[in-house]
Amino acid sequence: MNKQELTELTEFSRGYTKEVWFIHGANATPTSFNYIKESLERDPELNEYKFVDIIYDCQENLKSIISVLARSAPKDKQLYIIGHSLGGVVAVGVSQKIIQFDMPVSLRGVITMSSPFGGSESADYLRWLYPQYHLFRSISTTSRVITDLKSVGAVVPTLSLVTTSGNNPLFSSANDGVVTVASQRALKKSVYVEMPYNHFEVLVSTETVQHIKLFLKKQ
């Protein structure tokens, strides 16, 4: 039996019927979600859930990343997607692609944290100063990914945790130290919950874990 067959057998024996994708932010790694995943794994009511780390390079074309992930979605399990920061943009983009092309995927919902759905005004300028840095083009307010995201909005049940603490003085409006509150609230048809944390504290908050547990068990 090869490694893939052994993995599939183990999954079957454990009775996985649901899969949760964790998509990290720009220049981050799956380590970002360690606290959240460990907390979820201790909940006996979530034994049916398989937790999967999604790794991507934010220097690659974001539209291509979204398309590849949508095509990779499991056909035999209910799917939930959780994303932090840019990972939330990717998560919503994947959900839109799955619904747009009527893919045979049982996508149950999306959870985002501190995500720049409205793009970044800073990136509008930085993309010209650093044209080799693809991330700035991806999250500029006029990028195709951002404009499509805002135009279509949430297409499945979506919970967006909006972080409001941090207040970087370099921004002209309320922000979490990295992303403005306005940008986090730019996704239509999402349910918003404000969290009194900065851009990174949300990842180690017990309140965040409770919101995720409630969402997973409800959908």
Predicted regions located by residue number:
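Short, surface-exposed "cap/lid" segments of acyl-processing enzymes
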Residues: N2-E48
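Alpha-helical elements of Rossmann-like donor-binding domains used by nucleotide-donor carbohydrate transfer enzymes
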Residues: Y35, S39, S64-V68, G93, ...
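C-terminal catalytic-base region of ester-bond hydrolases, centering on the histidine
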Residues: G153-Q219
